[in-house]
Curated annotation (Swiss-Prot):
Participates in chromosomal partition during cell division. May act via the formation of a condensin-like complex containing Smc and ScpB that pull DNA away from mid-cell into both cell halves. InterPro entries: ScpA (IPR003768). Belongs to the ScpA family. It is found in: Cytoplasm. HAMAP family: ScpA (MF_01805). GO terms for biological process: cell division; chromosome segregation; DNA replication. Keywords: Cell cycle, Cell division, Chromosome partition, Cytoplasm. This is Segregation and condensation protein A. Component of a cohesin-like complex composed of ScpA, ScpB and the Smc homodimer, in which ScpA and ScpB bind to the head domain of Smc. The presence of the three proteins is required for the association of the complex with DNA.
Amino acid sequence: MAQENKQNSRTAEHLTFKLDQFEGPLDLLLHLIKQNEMDIYDIQVAEITSQYIDYLHQMQDLRLDIAGEYLVIAATLLNIKSKMLLPVEQEQQVEEDYVDPREDLVQQLVSHQLYQEVAAKFHVMEKQRMELFSREQAVNEDVTYEVSEGTTIDLLQKAFAKLMARKKVKKIKKIKRKIIPERYTIKEEIENIEHTLKMHKGTMNFTDLFDFDGEVEVEKVVTSFLALLELVRVGRVSASQEENNGPILMTYEGKAEEDAI
């Protein structure tokens, strides 16, 4: 008991952050996972649940309102923890239809983390663009470049995140994260997209750029998505969807007046 109290006390010392530091419960969970240096695909549910609940208790002690979404994730963690405490037959563990209780939560976390990575890249690009000054080009009123009707950048981002999140955990593990500066650049991926589109008679799905049966790095997919947005912006490629969050169809439109990055 003394050891448990000591551990809880040590945990509480680390829970000095505030609610407004996080965008939501998934943001908090990612923080705890990184703080404990855990693999996002192999979360130690008991430890994370304990710290997460301690955090909510701390908020209550400070008399701060806790959003309902935080309580929903707390209930989810407790449910996963209880399932993982149940004995599992060895034969069941090796069956193909065995479902890890953590799978849905892991996919939510991976999708949320992907949003963060894309948002961070947009922030860097925006900051870099603010430091540049260029002469405005004459407006050609006869030429307009738009994504297809009903398709917005926000919908493209949601479809992109859905593409990454729909993979099962085992397959997601194949998407490796490597911190290698400038391994992929937007300029190179722009050239790759245009070349590949020409090879496919000018039309193809964004997902066809990658071999998800092999190893695909998140950095590669994110950079390719940013390259697509840049090509759409300058009018060299159009993007469309038959339905919200559906596959992203790319169509090569040829050279535009404005050069891409």
